[in-house]
UniProtKB/Swiss-Prot annotation:
Name of the gene: Segment-9
Domain of life: Viruses
Cellular component GO terms, alphabetical: viral capsid
Gene source species: Banna virus
Purpose of the protein: Spike-forming protein that mediates virion attachment to the host cell receptors and plays a major role in cell penetration.
Keywords associated with the record: Capsid protein, Host-virus interaction, Viral attachment to host cell, Virion, Virus entry into host cell
Cell compartment(s), UniProt: Virion
Gene3D superfamilies named among the record's database cross-references: Reoviridae VP9, N-terminal domain (6.10.100.10)
GO biological process per UniProt: symbiont entry into host cell; virion attachment to host cell
Keyword Disulfide bond tagged: no
UniProt subunit comment: Trimers.
Protein name (record): Spike protein VP9
Amino acid sequence: MLSETELRALKKLSTTTTRVVGDSTLALPSNVKLSKGEVEKIAVTKKEMFDELAQCNLPTIELITREHTFNGDAIRFAAWLFLMNGQKLMTANNVVVRMGMQYSTNLAGNNVEINYVTSNSVVKLGHIPAGVLAAPYSGKGSGLFITYEQNLITNTVETGKVCVLFITSLSTTASAVNSFAYSYCNVPVESWDFNMIKLTAETSCASLTAMTNLVNTLVPDDRVRPVGLYVDIPGVTVTTSASLGSLPITTIPATTPLIFSAYTKQVEEVGVVNTLYALSYLP
């Protein structure tokens, strides 16, 4: 694999031949001096390699396939599809309402039509009725839930707002201690930006600080790595609970306008939730 500079250098050392560039070029012996065309045929540049890895493009596919594969990005789609259906790691069924789609799978595993929300003539998000959760959330796991106008913690209607909720075990899966907490916020739909939301164990924020303090109340052998809800949207406050003796939520009402939901069975796998979110929404 060559850099662009190395490729140019090889071309300068090339010669003129009467050979026709084609598949036979790859079979030329090692002691033959190549023409510029033969150099281009044989060489693989770093840029070409990275372009292929980044896009893995499927240029001739139909529109309905492009929609499902992030515009032909087969590598991204394969990773996304694996996590969406990773029931060994996560409680079924994950919900991801992706922008630009017509239908999305609900908590029951059924495809339902997406309702889109517009603010100032801009489509901000889509949501679907949650449906009936296949099995209650349980165990010492961790989950991210995004709903439209329905706060799952306070059970209140938040008109014109996107409600983000992160729940997590503070103790390890192997620990005998039951300790949980949550962080949540309500974001005005006109300010909503998928790119400004993430779970973090390293970016300083109020939620991570609060979660760290809660984790540190446990004995060292029971502690998980603290993870918080990071929201980089002006004017939005993230609230974190005190420690709790049980999961903050175990189900989602069937009529809830749901945008995203994913819950790992074991808290140590929280990074899977972040990865699924990033694959689903980030550029």
